[in-house]
Every structure is written in structure tokens, then in C-alpha cells.
Amino acid sequence: MSNKKLILKLFICSTIFITFVFALHDKRVVAASSVNELENWSKWMQPIPDNIPLARISIPGTHDSGTFKLQNPIKQVWGMTQEYDFRYQMDHGARIFDIRGRLTDDNTIVLHHGPLYLYVTLHEFINEAKQFLKDNPSETIIMSLKKEYEDMKGAEGSFSSTFEKNYFVDPIFLKTEGNIKLGDARGKIVLLKRYSGSNESGGYNNFYWPDNETFTTTVNQNVNVTVQDKYKVNYDEKVKSIKDTMDETMNNSEDLNHLYINFTSLSSGGTAWNSPYYYASYINPEIANDIKQKNPTRVGWVIQDYINEKWSPLLYQEVIRANKSLIKE
């Protein structure tokens, strides 16, 4: 009788142990699978919990996102910062888009880089973003909008009123503010307003954006924002500014109410040897390698020139991988 009881106890214990081992294995498989989902670049936001603020997520973006249609070699040296279209940028992980516009005489907004017309309209960008979000509803698109050049003669109204009456009314735009969480932003375009005269709420408002500086400001009442946007400096100063801001971001990784925006772009000197492309070919892999070596839990919003697959390690991929700490096991 005692032998039977002993055998029964051993059987029960072994069953419990095997169940525990399989449960632990399944948990690890699920966790590993979730982390691996970060590397599906068109859907990398999917495994990140809904309650995480966008300000806390490390997000890659593109500087002067609409310059990819420039064909003239001289204009390319001066003004081209992206070689691939919006959908390519989105499919390769970019979720922040630096959109700069001009109001036309038919009261539409077209994209500009300084005085350069980019042969792209704001409608084109919004439609591309809508299609991408329809295909990938787990994602969000952050659209930074700035008035880049004086209105055309004959334009009626203002840049801000035209945008808000003719574009922002689209339900694709998130109309809430505050410290926006990913769950509220999925499937939406989140507006970051770099233009003045706004009468509408929604997105990130009231930006004070001094030129060629690193600065800290407050938006949406209680969200602190540090921006590094030095673009008219020498190469060494630029790289130092990027790394200093990134180090501050890493050291402040648990502050959910502080957003860090870090531009890696440098303005053109007018030749092939000091063009945005030339600078990006060195800066992008250097910053990517710095992230890879430090293995941080947060690097902020990193806005780059020339998102592509040319210069290893790839900056946008290292930025996205910094989010692995946000994925719950």
C-alpha cells in the first residue's frame, strides 16, 4: 500500500513539474516571439503595450521627408534628404515625418524644402499614410507640419486655417492631446504642430522651436520636450550634440512625461563632399553603432536623412530595437 502511495505521489509531482517546464518554455517562446515582432519593420509597434506614451517609445523618423522626387543634380546636392518615397520610408520603420509646406494660389498645400518645390502635395502624403495605416492598423504616423515658404500670390486665408479646414478635418487625424498613448494613436495620424495660428486641438501643440539649437520646451500643458536640431554646425559638433542628447535620453529612460527629439541631419555645404547624403553616410552608421554598443532601453525620437539599407549598422533598426524593454514577458 505504501509503495502505491509513493508511486502516486511521484506521478503527481512529475506531472506538476512537466507542466511547469512547458509553461515556462511557452512563456519564453511568446516573449521571444514578441521581441522578434519588433523586427517586422512595417508592424514593429504591434507588440508594444497600448498604455505606453508615444513620448516613451524610441521612434525613427525622416528629415524633410518629401524630397525624394528632386531630379536636378544641383538641387539634389542642396536639398535632397531622402531618396525613397513615403511608403518605402514607412515600410522601413519610419513613423515620424517632417512635412514642410507652402500654401498655393488654389488653396492647397504643396511640399517645399526652403524655396525648392518638391513635386509632392500634402494630399499625397496623407493618402499614403492612410493606406499604410489601413494595411498596418497597429501603427501610428506622427506628422510634423511646418510652414516652410511664403504663400503664393493669390492664396486665400492662411496656411494654418487652410490646413485645419481642408485637411485636419479628416478623421484619420487624432483629435486628442495630453501625453498621447500608443493605444489611442494606433491607426491615426498624430499632428505635431510647427506652424502658428492654430485654432484646433489635437496632437502636440504650442511648439516653441528656436533655430539651430538644442532646447527644452513644454507642450500639451505637461509634456516636456527636449529637441536637438543643430543643422548649421560643423561635423564634430553635430555628432557630439546627437550623442549628448541621446545619452541624456538614455539616462532619463523612466520619465514618461519627457519627450526627446534628436535630429541627425546636417545642412548642405553645396558640394557632393558636404551634402546631406555625404554626411548621412557617416553619421547614420556611427550613431547606430553607438546605440548597438550601449544597448539602451530608450533613445527617443531619432530623425534621420536617407533612410535606406546602405550603411551598416542601420540606424532605424537600432532605434526600433531599443524598445525591447517595453515588451512584457
From Swiss-Prot:
PROSITE patterns associated with the record: PIPLC_X_DOMAIN
All copies of domain PI-PLC X-box, residue ranges: 51-194
Pfam family membership, one: PI-PLC-X
Protein role: Cleaves glycosylphosphatidylinositol (GPI) and phosphatidylinositol (PI) anchors but not PI phosphates.
PANTHER family: PTHR13593, SI:DKEY-266F7.9
Recorded GO MF terms: phosphatidylinositol diacylglycerol-lyase activity; phosphoric diester hydrolase activity
Entry EC number(s): 4.6.1.13
Reactions mediated catalytically: a 1,2-diacyl-sn-glycero-3-phospho-(1D-myo-inositol) = 1D-myo-inositol 1,2-cyclic phosphate + a 1,2-diacyl-sn-glycerol
Database matches in SUPFAM superfamilies: PLC-like phosphodiesterases
Protein name: 1-phosphatidylinositol phosphodiesterase
Cellular compartment(s): Secreted
Residue positions of the active site: 63 (proton acceptor), 113 (proton donor)
GO biological process terms held by the UniProt record: lipid catabolic process
Keywords: Lipid degradation, Lipid metabolism, Lyase, Secreted, Signal
Keyword Signal: yes
Signal peptide: 1-31
Keyword Calcium among record annotations: no
GO CC terms: extracellular region
